[in-house]
Design a protein with these regions (language model features):
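Terminal domain-initiation and capping elements
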Residues: 1-94
């Protein structure tokens, strides 16, 4: 007996889109603390760049600090939360 495989259409139109790690503004983290957390966690983010991102978070209320594969996004999200940063839920990039 032989069987045939039929290909099912993909139902996830967002397949392959990156995930955003978003830090929210709060009233308990300092610019220096945010910069340290970002530079300690995210690849390619220096302390100086972390200060610029912290300023953006403060002025806008939130910032996408990293975007990429879901597994890495989850790891970075947990690490930043561990530093005490206020995190938005992971979001799919648009």
């Amino acid at each position: 007996m032989t069987s045939t495989l039929t290909e099912r259409p993909r139902t996830d139109s967002d397949l392959g889109k990156p995930w955003n790690v978003i830090v929210l503004n709060d009233n308990h983290n300092t610019f220096q603390g945010v910069a340290f957390a970002l530079s300690s966690t995210l690849p390619g983010v220096s302390y100086e760049r972390g200060l610029k991102i912290a300023d953006r978070i403060h002025n806008i209320g939130r910032a996408v600090v990293w975007s990429g594969h879901k597994e890495a996004a989850e790891l970075y999200w947990e690490s930043l939360r561990g530093f005490g940063l206020t995190m938005a839920p992971l979001e799919r990039a648009s």
